[in-house]
Amino acid sequence: MLENKKHKKMSLSGKSLLMGTLSTAAIVLSASTVNAATNTDTVDNANASQVTTVKASASVNKNDNSGLKENATNDKVAGTETNLNSSLNSGKETSSQVNDSKEDSSSTQVGSTPISSAIINNGKASSDLNQDSDNISDHFKDNNSQGQSSTSSEKTELKGKIKEIVNNSGIDVTKLTNDQINNLNKVNFDNDPQDGTKLTLNDLDAIGQALIRRDPKYAVPYFNAKEIKNMDAAETKDAQTGKTETLEIWDSWPVQDPITGYVSNYKGYQLVIAMMGMPKKNDNHIYLLYNKYNDNEFSHWRNAGSIFGYNETPDLQEWSGSAIVNKDGSVQLFYTKNDTSNGKLNDQQLATANLKLNVDNNGVSIASVDNDHVIFIGDGKHYQTYDQFSNGKNRNRDNYTLRDPHVVEEENGDRYLVFEANTGSNNYQGEDQVYRWANYGGNDKFNVNNFLSYFGNNDDQALASVANGALGILKLSGDQNNPTVKLDDVYSPLVTSLMVSDEMERPDIVKVGNKYYLFSATRLSRGTKGEITRLANKVVGDNVAMIGFVSDSLTHGYVPLNGSGVVLTASVPANWRTATYSYYAVPIEGKENQLLITAYMTNRGEVAGKGNNSTWAPSFILQLNPDNTTTVLAKLTNQGVWVWNGDSENKNMIGSLEKDSPNSAALDGEWGKFIDWDAINSYSLKPHQPVTPNVPTTPEKPENPTTPNTPDTPRTPEVPTTPVKKTTQSELPKAGAKDGIAATILGAISSMLGVIGLAGISKRKRNN
């Protein structure tokens, strides 16, 4: 027994000696290891002043008739300032001047009044604005306190054209990592397939900056919140329950004259079709509303009921579209069928139906709905199909769209549909789009910074790789009352937003004189530049906009209005009563330089308070200038005005951003109210799901959550905020004299501990 105890003691001593020996060896190894280590510079975003000049190439569609085969290239407005710090202090834009006229000299009242104090975004106050704005543009601020980089013998070299571009950008090439250089060397400078005009990342950035600085040329006017009412005609029989319910109303469109686009005078009435449904329910169906032509009174609107009856279900919904009058007096409706049955994620299809109406002393009623059928589900080449989407990669981040058909009739009787979609296999989504230089659209510094920013942010890069928004066009065939689509009449897109955005909603073409104006509602949060969305949400409290393009031809040649495409931008927080969206432009009879802008007001789900339902907004005037610019005018109407006349203007609707003003744009209690983005977006359509970022730090709480495919599904964020980057080094620092001394001391301490006899160390499990 004594021998055994002695043996055990000797064994413990042996372990201690072994630990001492190993620790001594560790001193030598640690010193050599530290001396051999090199530091990889981290890359962060910093603010940089960038002046960009952009040229938009508007290419002809592939499948156009021979008479349409021409290229139109137009210069965008130059001099877009992209320094957010400076733009936040500016209420004006140094772009082209607005043509003044005696009649229309009034301008929108939206100015530079601070609004950030009115906003709380998911618990995070906007006082961090300056800190966040410092992280927008310049990707190359060196965070390494030692300023060291890899030796030239270890560095990969830039090659070819990208080398010159990086040098021109003013970026220190020595600060680039090998991974960054390898990615830059993969940049694709080839010409794009001819898929119409590009909405570039630089355009998206400029749109965001205009929104953030609340540029008065583009900002939606402030409305007097105390004047806003729910719609009387929204108290009606619900399409799903068959019972009288209080409904909300949002996306709406008038029945229009097929040639002029004016709101049709249909036997003395104006007709509007609208999406309606119960608050906080998965209830999305379309109804017919009517009022006497030229009647400006909101309370006079009446509801003719659900177009497709009262046995509707949440699984089969109708979304927005357009409508015109046929030669026989019937109404041709174009709309979106949305199928969410059997687990589908918004299987959208373009559809049409023929409506025959009765008009008598009791008003307007629906006599019959005939020839209801789907006319287009995508062709796979020009436009993505649901099967391509559902079988694709990164589906949890992808956003499938094929909706919002807008009908246009040419003078020769040919009818076309313009619609929201995603690009097909001819120019498809994918990681290769992030390498396509034409998608960036800015100067060298902007392009390089943002290219590397994608590869430093897994979330934005993943979104960019699936972003493939498109505004499409096709030609209709067959009888007016029962149209069809031939595959040969499916043209390539008018506008694409590959890598930039996955969603450009509700396209609307208005012909004014000899020009075609193409508009679309969108959100910065559907784009792939997360920083600009977060900043917009902090400064303004919302990120919605309307973009626009102009061409001399219906089927090709569109160039962005105002240089970047920005036409309208949000001006108040999304949870205020006076927040607006789903903008729709209507031509004004007798006015070739003005359009009437309609919208819905108050986001769905009672986000502005109990009983404050989504309703029609007051309309306002958009000035069209001869130099392809636009200006918002402070000419407001009652709610629900679709036909502008001499009695339409109502100055009592003009609001103010002053908190205690009697015409404040905010209701009592809205100023400084917490913005719950889950609730704001809970009725949107995007099925994105968040992905855990592959970084060691804890992500911040997302400020811009996405929307689910169905309104009753619990909401998750669409664009999680970029996680806070670690300020500590993730690798061993490059050794200096102090580092060597520190390593020696640590090794000596380890030796002492080993000699003392930490025998238990040998029992620890290794972490594999």
Curated annotation (Swiss-Prot):
Residues 691-727 have a biased composition (Low complexity). This is Levansucrase. InterPro entries: Glyco_hydro_68 (IPR003469), Glyco_hydro_beta-prop_sf (IPR023296), LPXTG_anchor (IPR019931). Its EC number is 2.4.1.10. Residues 57-68, 80-99, 106-134, 143-153 have a biased composition (Polar residues). It is a peptidoglycan-anchor. It is found in: Secreted, Cell wall; Cell surface. The lineage of its organism: Bacteria, Bacillati, Bacillota, Bacilli, Lactobacillales. The gene is levG. Residues 736-768 form a propeptide. It comes from Lactobacillus gasseri. The record marks 404 as: Transition state stabilizer. GO terms for cellular component: cell surface; extracellular region. Residues 57-158, 688-736 are annotated as: Disordered. The keyword Magnesium does not apply. The active site is at 251 (nucleophile), 505 (proton donor/acceptor).
